[in-house]
C-alpha cells in the first residue's frame, strides 16, 4: 500500500519553507539529544546524520561536578543535558523535579550554550526545541534569556534582540512532532522513490 496522505495542521513543524523560516534547526532533548536541520527545504546530511547532541560545550565544573553520562564523550551536550544526565546528577528524573529546582537553571545554561553554538555555525531563521525534558514549562523561557548573553553581542539580529520568543520556539505539535515528522518523511520517500 502507498496511500499515506496525512491530514491536519502538521506542516508547521515539518515544512519550514511554508513558514518562511528556511533554514531551520530542530533540537530534541529527551533520553538523548538529537538535532536536524532543513536547508533549502532539504534535510541536512553529510558523512552521517547531524549529531548535535555530541557537541562539546563548556562544563561548569564549579557548579556541576557531575562527570556526564555519555558513554563516548562523557560531558558532551547529551552527557550533561539529556534526561539520563538530569537523573544521574540529581537522583530523580526531570519530571519529578519541581520548577524551582536548581536543575533547571543548569539545564538552561547548557542548552543555551548549544543554541548559541548552532546560531553561530548555521545561522538558522528559527530554532525549535522539543522533547520530554522541555515539558518543564520554565525551561524554554530560561534558555531564551541566556542565549543572548551566551552570544555576548556577537549576533546582533532583530530575531534575537527583539523577538527571541518567535525565534526559539517549542514544536507546535508538542510531543507529536517527531512521529508526524517521521510520517512526512515516509510520505515524501514514497512519492519520490529515488530517495529510497
Go through each PLM region and give its residues.
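Single conserved hydrophobic/aromatic residue that forms the stacking wall/gate
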Residues: 1-10, 14
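Extracytoplasmic/secreted proteins and extracellular or luminal domains
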Residues: 7-8, 48, 120
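ATP-binding/phosphotransfer module of carbohydrate and carboxylate kinases, centering on a glycine-rich
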Residues: 17-25, 59-196
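Short beta-strand scaffold segments in enzyme catalytic cores
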Residues: 33-38
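A short, polar/charged loop-to-alpha-helix boundary motif
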Residues: 48-63
Amino acid at each position: 500500500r502507498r496511500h499515506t496522505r496525512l491530514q491536519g495542521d502538521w506542516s508547521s513543524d515539518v515544512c519550514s519553507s511554508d513558514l518562511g523560516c528556511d533554514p531551520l534547526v530542530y533540537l530534541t532533548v529527551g533520553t538523548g539529544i538529537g538535532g536536524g536541520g532543513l536547508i533549502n527545504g532539504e534535510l541536512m546530511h553529510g558523512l552521517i546524520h547531524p549529531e548535535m547532541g555530541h557537541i562539546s560545550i563548556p562544563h561548569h565544573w564549579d557548579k556541576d561536578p557531575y562527570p556526564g553520562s555519555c558513554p563516548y564523550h562523557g560531558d558532551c551536550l547529551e552527557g550533561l543535558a539529556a534526561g539520563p544526565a538530569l537523573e544521574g546528577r540529581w537522583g530523580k528524573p526531570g519530571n519529578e523535579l519541581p520548577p524551582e529546582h536548581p536543575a533547571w537553571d543548569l539545564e538552561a545554561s547548557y542548552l543555551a550554550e548549544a543554541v548559541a553554538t548552532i546560531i553561530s555555525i548555521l545561522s538558522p531563521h528559527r530554532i525549535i526545541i522539543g522533547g520530554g525534558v522541555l515539558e518543564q514549562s520554565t525551561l524554554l523561557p530560561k534558555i531564551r534569556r541566556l542565549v543572548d548573553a551566551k552570544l555576548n553581542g556577537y549576533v546582533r539580529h532583530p530575531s534575537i534582540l527583539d523577538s527571541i520568543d518567535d525565534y526559539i520556539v517549542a514544536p507546535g505539535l508538542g510531543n507529536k512532532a517527531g512521529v508526524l515528522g517521521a510520517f512526512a518523511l515516509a510520505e515524501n520517500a514514497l512519492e519520490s522513490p529515488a530517495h529510497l
